[in-house]
Amino acid sequence: VHKWGEHDLVSAIVQEPIGLSAGRMAALQLSKGEWVAITDIDVRPEPNWIEELLNSSQSQGDENVMAVTGRTVFAKSSDTVSLIRSVEIESKYRSRPRITSLANGPCSMFKRECLLNVGGFNPEWYHAEDMEVSLKLIASGGIIVYSPDAVVNHVPETGIGRFLSKRSRDARAHVRIVRNYPSKNRKRPGFD
């Protein structure tokens, strides 16, 4: 990490293991650009990922684009869970509209000033921080655009135990989102 930080345009942040959301917030606060992109450790962005996000960042008409989200492709392995998960995610992205309600954590870019104005990433959220900031951006009058050509490749998700553990974590996060952001208070109640 320190080696990457030696580049003129790169800053390396070293901190205690205090969580993904806290790490994202630290990076957001130190960032200087108009747009800030985020990804996850278990994905590999395609070489043109940032370019594709930027190509989709222009507002059309009276839109106020505050975030652009790409497409996550789950790699397949011989494991049944991996095959099911990759098909499930592929199906989800196939029917996703251009204006969407979620800037996915592994593959999104945010207008820095807008993200800071809504409070950025809450370090107390252990999971679903992407969902929370998405709802806040939409509530502030922004939109999130889906850019299907901005691709990141996710490592295969294998093993039933790991799969169930992650889905349990997702369920807890969804409950927390619904509790803190009930559908009656959201501009677009659906999650896609």
Give a label for each model feature.
Residues 1-14:
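Acidic donor-binding segment of Leloir-type glycosyltransferases
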Residues 151-192:
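Active-site-adjacent helix/loop segment of glycosyltransferases
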Residues 48-80:
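Conserved donor NDP-sugar-binding/catalytic core segment of glycosyltransferases
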Residues 108-110, 114-119, 124-151:
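A short, conserved alpha-helix in the catalytic core of glycosyltransferases
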Residues 15-31:
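Glycine-rich, basic loop-to-helix element that forms the pyrophosphate-binding segment
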Residues 40-44:
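The conserved acidic donor/metal-binding loop of glycosyltransferases
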Residues 74-76, 91-110, 126, 132:
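A recurrent flexible, glycine/aromatic-enriched loop bordering the glycosyltransferase active site
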Residues 36:
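Short aromatic/hydrophobic "clamp" motif used to bind/position activated sugar donors
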